[in-house]
Amino acid sequence: MTKAIQKIGSRRNGRIASRKNGRRIPKGVIHVQASFNNTIVTVTDVRGQVVSWSSAGTCGFRGTRRGTPFAAQTAAANAIRTVVDQGMQRAEVMIKGPGLGRDAALRAIRRSGILLSFVRDVTPMPHNGCRPPKKRRV
């Protein structure tokens, strides 16, 4: 006679449950990717697991308004609001890209009350790599 195998729950259900319970995150890394068209703010723990993220597009900005400093400020405040509730006190900031939202996002992060260990610019710079596209003629 075979024993019935108990189903504890699928892997997917367990993952959702672990995401819902707000585990305490004292320290994290805030990644700001600022392009000319959009600004994406991702908050991870020190191991690199994504805790929260937001972008100007998810905050309701559409078209050219996504690249504005105000949209970046709103996206940063939106991403940080959830991790402050989970107890984040210290963070490192990595800023990537040439966009207008760089400074506005950093200002919003400073205003949130999280202590910043350091702010690092991680924009990739080529050591004369690929040939750039030809200049636009308007």
Curated annotation (Swiss-Prot):
GO MF term (any one): rRNA binding
GO BP annotations listed: translation
Gene name of this polypeptide: rps11
Sorted UniProt keywords: Chloroplast, Plastid, Ribonucleoprotein, Ribosomal protein, RNA-binding, rRNA-binding
Keyword DNA repair tagged: no
PANTHER family: 40S RIBOSOMAL PROTEIN S14/30S RIBOSOMAL PROTEIN S11 (PTHR11759)
Name of the protein in question: Small ribosomal subunit protein uS11c
Subunit-level organization: Part of the 30S ribosomal subunit.
Principal location class: plastid
